[in-house]
């Protein structure tokens, strides 16, 4: 299985670096995921081959129950932390057009799938239709290539089977 290196110290370094990933632009929610955030600067020098970002883009309904949404999101996030492998969770705020982008960055695809199968995550997903006018879930491989010229990060979309 390609992915995160299993050395605890390296995982700790990558986890710490991932906390520095932040939006580069106010309109990050409408940009391609690779362009809207500080991936390269935050992950410079970190030892990994491949990570698994899961990106949730949505347009909230004007009458969305934000408290209910927050409760479900918080429970799913807590379960994801407990399951292991979550490197970064970015919870975006809706813009003036109610567009929002959030993402989870995982060590491996398998860890993301395990967390997505939890009851708290399924419960959060179940309220999606009443909270959002539209939403899409995109998955990627975030790969690091090291050459004589330096490091390069690439985002490879994963198409549904």
Language-model segments: which ranges?
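Compact nucleic-acid interaction/catalytic patches
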Residues: 119-125
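A structure-centric signal for secondary-structure junctions around beta-strands
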Residues: 50, 99-100, 134
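Generic surface-pattern signal
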Residues: 26, 117, 130-133
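Conserved short beta-strand edge segments in small beta-sheet-based binding/regulatory domains
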Residues: 125-140
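Short, well-ordered beta-strand segments in beta-rich or mixed alpha/beta enzyme
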Residues: 54-58, 89-118
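Short S/T/G/P-rich N-terminal loop/turn motif that feeds into the first structured element of a domain
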Residues: 1-95, 140-161
């Amino acid at each position: 299985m390609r992915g995160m290196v299993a050395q605890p110290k390296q995982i700790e370094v990558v986890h710490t670096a991932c906390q520095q990933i932040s939006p580069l632009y106010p309109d990050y929610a409408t940009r391609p995921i690779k362009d809207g955030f500080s991936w390269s600067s935050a992950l410079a020098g970190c030892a990994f081959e491949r990570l698994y970002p899961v990106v949730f883009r949505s347009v909230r309904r004007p009458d969305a129950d934000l408290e209910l949404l927050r409760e479900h999101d918080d429970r799913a996030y807590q379960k994801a932390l407990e399951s292991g492998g979550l490197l970064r969770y970015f919870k975006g705020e809706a813009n003036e057009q109610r567009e929002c982008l959030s993402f989870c960055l995982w060590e491996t695809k398998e860890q993301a799938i395990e967390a997505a199968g939890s009851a708290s995550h399924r419960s959060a997903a179940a309220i999606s239709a009443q909270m959002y006018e539209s939403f899409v879930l995109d998955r990627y491989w975030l790969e690091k290539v090291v050459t004589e010229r330096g490091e390069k990060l690439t985002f490879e979309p994963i198409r549904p089977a």
